[in-house]
């Protein structure tokens, strides 16, 4: 019972940390990180543009920018695919099928899905998943100032649920080294750096507490 109470307290503490870190992440120049996302007039006109060189996402409705945010893209050996795609699968509480953890009783150890490691496999949380190519998607995660992912596109916890609300199955996605919006919108995008943020406790990452649920409206009229 004492162990159960201790673990429950740990989960509560880590959940508080996850939510607090999303609210108080600092941006270049100081201040808390906050993303404003505007409700589209016509959801069928929404288009997503990704600039790999700037590591920016622009969610557009014609010439209107609904949301412009920093992101993390793939490293050179595992690049984010370039080209024209569409969102075709959304999953709010997705877990990775490739890498994550093995649960060994009270121990939780990092492990790839196919590794010869004992225990029950639980994939790494990839909340607010929006898939645009097989095994590639936008999802919540730490955002770094340099390419960091295995090809997916990570959004900060402040931005991921808003992106999820803006796109739907069929939303076009254009990924290129540069985008026309780099010159007009890019300089206004807040930079965020999670590189110094500590990793959450693995025991929390294998629980439902790993998935944040936003409160309040996501999109501004």
Model-derived segments and spans:
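Bacterial N-terminal signal peptides that target proteins for export
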Residues: 1-9
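Short amphipathic alpha-helical segments with coiled-coil-like heptad repeat character
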Residues: 2, 65-66, 169
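Bacterial N-terminal signal peptides
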Residues: 8-20
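Generic anion/oxyanion-binding catalytic loop in active/binding sites
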Residues: 11, 46, 149
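Short, structurally constrained coil/turn elements
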Residues: 16-18, 81, 167-169
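Exported/periplasmic cell-wall-interacting domains
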Residues: 22, 27, 100-221
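Cell wall/extracellular polymer interaction/catalysis modules
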Residues: 22-105, 109, 114-121, 127-128, ...
């Amino acid at each position: 019972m004492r162990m159960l109470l201790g673990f429950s307290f740990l989960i509560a503490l880590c959940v508080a940390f996850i939510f607090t870190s999303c609210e108080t992440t600092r941006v270049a120049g100081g201040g808390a990180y906050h993303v404003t996302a505007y409700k589209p007039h016509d959801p069928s006109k929404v288009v997503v543009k990704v600039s790999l060189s700037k590591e920016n996402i622009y969610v557009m409705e014609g010439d209107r920018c609904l949301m412009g945010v920093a992101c993390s893209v793939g490293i050179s050996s595992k690049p984010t695919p370039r080209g024209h795609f569409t969102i075709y699968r959304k999953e709010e509480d997705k877990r990775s099928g490739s890498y994550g953890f093995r649960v060994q009783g009270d121990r939780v150890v990092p492990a790839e899905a196919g590794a010869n490691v004992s225990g029950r496999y639980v994939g790494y949380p990839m909340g607010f998943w929006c898939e645009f190519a097989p095994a590639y998607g936008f999802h919540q995660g730490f955002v770094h100032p340099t390419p960091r992912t295995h090809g997916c596109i990570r959004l900060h916890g402040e931005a991921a649920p808003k992106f999820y609300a803006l796109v739907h199955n069929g939303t076009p996605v254009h990924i290129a080294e540069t985008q026309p919006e780099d010159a007009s919108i890019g300089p206004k995008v807040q930079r965020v750096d999670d590189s110094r943020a500590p990793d959450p406790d693995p025991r929390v990452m294998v629980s439902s507490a790993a998935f944040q649920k936003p409160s309040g409206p996501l999109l501004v009229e």
